């Protein structure tokens, strides 16, 4: 998957759609991790994305299957 950008819509395995409002790139031990802030409907969520998998303690988790770029 390409690098995530503001305005992208991320589609997850369960059908959840996350509209990306902001993204930051973090480098850690030679890995690039994307910190994504976005909205699902009207709810704001934050998550970390690495290798097309989103994970956070109390945010969005799961595999991203598609990235739509309007």
Give, region by region, the residue ranges found by the protein language model.
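Conserved "cap/hinge" positions at secondary-structure junctions
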Residues: 13-14, 28
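Short acidic/polar mixed-charge low-complexity motifs
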Residues: 14-17, 42
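Short, isolated positions in well-ordered beta-strands
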Residues: 17-18, 33, 65
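Short beta-strand-centered aromatic/proline hotspots
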Residues: 17-25
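Short, solvent-exposed secondary-structure boundary/capping segments
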Residues: 27-39
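Intrinsically disordered, low-complexity, charged/polar segments
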Residues: 41-70
């Amino acid at each position: 998957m390409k690098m995530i950008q503001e305005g992208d819509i991320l589609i997850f395995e369960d059908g959840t759609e996350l509209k990306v409002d902001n993204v930051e790139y973090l480098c850690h031990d030679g890995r690039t991790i994307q910190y994504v802030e976005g909205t699902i409907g009207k709810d704001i969520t934050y998550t970390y994305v690495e290798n097309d998998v989103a994970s956070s303690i109390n945010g969005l988790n799961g595999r991203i299957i598609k990235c739509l770029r309007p």
